Amino acid sequence: MAIIPKNYARLESGYREKALKLFPWVCGRCSREFVYSNLRELTVHHIDHDHTNNPEDGSNWELLCLYCHDHEHSKYTEADQYGSTVIAGEDAQKDVGEATYNPFADLKAMMNKKK
């Protein structure tokens, strides 16, 4: 677990302000757009999870809405719990194949039987 510096609030406000100037106000995962009135719901995520790694070009930052940010961090919690690995920005669900069951496959035939 990373040690949180005493001046964390000041550091956070500094990189947040920079990130909001560098990037469009859009969640990097769900593409939700933000305006000034709901900007508090847009967070800065550190891609490498090191809150002290704040390069001026923003290469370690990603703007995420509250929900996507929570989801991103929950993946790491689950990985710790179950001993799996996580690749930043990727979901395990992407590896799952397409669904093969089609509930409407014979719908026309079923409807014709009732007539």
Swiss-Prot record:
Group of enzyme by EC: hydrolase
Gene3D superfamilies assigned: 1.10.30.50
CC per GO annotation: cytosol
The HNH domain, residue ranges: 27-75
UniProt keyword annotations, A-Z: Hydrolase, Nuclease
Signal peptide residue numbers: none
NCBIfam families (alphabetical): PRK11295.1
Record-given protein name: Putative HNH nuclease YajD
